[in-house]
Amino acid sequence: MQPRSKHTGMSENGNDKRDGDDGQTGVVIKTRPKTKKPSMYKVLMLNDDYTPMEFVVHVLERFFNKSREDATRVMLHVHTRGVGICGVYTYEVAETKVTQVMDLARQNQHPLQCTIEKE
């Protein structure tokens, strides 16, 4: 007669079964991290009494890819209202455009100013 064995939670092969693992495999579902859209920034041009209107139109055409008509419209808006939107971009692009405008204005000895504002 064999002695009665106590249940130890061990399977025949010695693996511990007490943790609820029945040896079956499961499927791991990978979720894609949600990507957040970057914040957008307006590049604003400020009016001054010294920068020639034609220079402002040139800047808008060159750095903001405006047509002559659109550039003239923005320039007149800046001239009459004191400030106008040149375009809306991600921060890095907006910052680059402001730097390009300010550098060209300085090279041509114009006090033209541009700033960035979060949309």
Swiss-Prot record:
Species lineage: Bacteria, Pseudomonadati, Pseudomonadota, Alphaproteobacteria, Rhodospirillales
Function (record text): Involved in the modulation of the specificity of the ClpAP-mediated ATP-dependent protein degradation.
InterPro entries noted in UniProt: ClpS, ClpS_core, Ribosomal_bL12_C/ClpS-like
Domain of life: Bacteria
Complex formation: Binds to the N-terminal domain of the chaperone ClpA.
Organism: Paramagnetospirillum magneticum (strain ATCC 700264 / AMB-1)
Family statement: Belongs to the ClpS family.
Region described as Disordered: spans on this chain: 1-34
GO biological processes: protein catabolic process; proteolysis
The protein's name: ATP-dependent Clp protease adapter protein ClpS
